[in-house]
Amino acid sequence: CVGLGYWLLGNDTPQTTFVSGGISIEPGTTKAVLVFNSGQQVKLTDSIAFEQAIEKFKPSGQVEQAIEYNKIIVPRGGEYNLVLADGTSVMINSDSKLSVPDRFEGKERRVRLEGEALFHVAQDVEHPFIVETDGGDVTVLGTVFNVNAYSGEDYVQTTLVEGRVAFQGKGMTDARTIAPGE
């Protein structure tokens, strides 16, 4: 919910340190690590954006073949905003990992999440957007939503801001469509 509020208010709000019972609570900072399929790692900061890192560190002269998945790892106390190749914007929360393809091809757009992220999905009715988690898959039907799927938790929580999503838990045969307020 904190990430959702931050996303809705925008990234230009002043950073504030909260004090509770003598303990300082610092706001999250923009930090993440991009791990390429090859294992090479690049620290993502304000000065090195996700898109720049992909272009800068992509091996030159290589013919594009199979889709490669890169992983964005956001450590505790961090957060990271990025825009995917299809125009979908994602705010990845603290202690989370998002695996994304170097390009979207085929009938669907699929990413894998461990942790929490807020998605503002670029609408494309011909190519559904799917967030895969350990607990199940969230299929987006053009929307803004948050997914909370941390490792070790017994649940996957989806908070819908607008639009609709369909959730199909692991081992379930049918998906359940969810609208705001449900």
Over which residues does each language-model region extend?
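Short acidic/polar, Gly/Pro-enriched loop/turn segments located at secondary-structure boundaries
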Residues: 1-155, 166-182
